[in-house]
C-alpha cells in the first residue's frame, strides 16, 4: 500500500503554487478537466507527485469543514522557510517552538486557502 496524494481545492492557482514552491515543492504538471477545472500536481524533489491542487472554475470559496486537521511538511531550515512565506504575507500562527530539548522545531501556517500546514525542522538523532 502507498499513499498516493492529497488533494486541496483552491481559489487562486498562482497564489497557491507560489506558497507551496516557497516550501520547496515543484510544480510537475497541470491537467485540465474539461471546461470545469484544472489540477496542478506538485511534489518535493526526489519524490512522486504528492499534492494535487484543484481549481474549479466559477467557485469562489469552500468550507474547510471540522474534520480536517493538517498536513506536515519537513523543511531543512524552518527560519528560511518562514522567511520565504513572510515575503508572501504568510505569518506563523505562533512562533516556532522545540518539541522537547534537542528535538524538532515546528510551527503551523495557513496556506492561501486557509489549510493548516505543519512545518517541521527535524533535528539529527
Spell out what each predicted region is:
Residues 1-17, 68-73, 120-125:
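N-terminal beta-strand motif that seeds the catalytic metal site of vicinal oxygen chelate
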Residues 2, 7-49:
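Core segments of cupin and vicinal oxygen chelate
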Residues 19, 79-84:
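Short amphipathic alpha-helices within nucleic acid-binding modules
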Residues 29-32, 41, 73, 82-125:
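Vicinal oxygen chelate
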Residues 36-38, 67, 103:
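Exposed loop/turn and edge beta-strand positions of beta-sandwich/beta-sheet ligand-binding modules
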Residues 45-49, 59-60, 78-80:
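Short, charged/polar surface micro-motifs in flexible loops or helix N-caps
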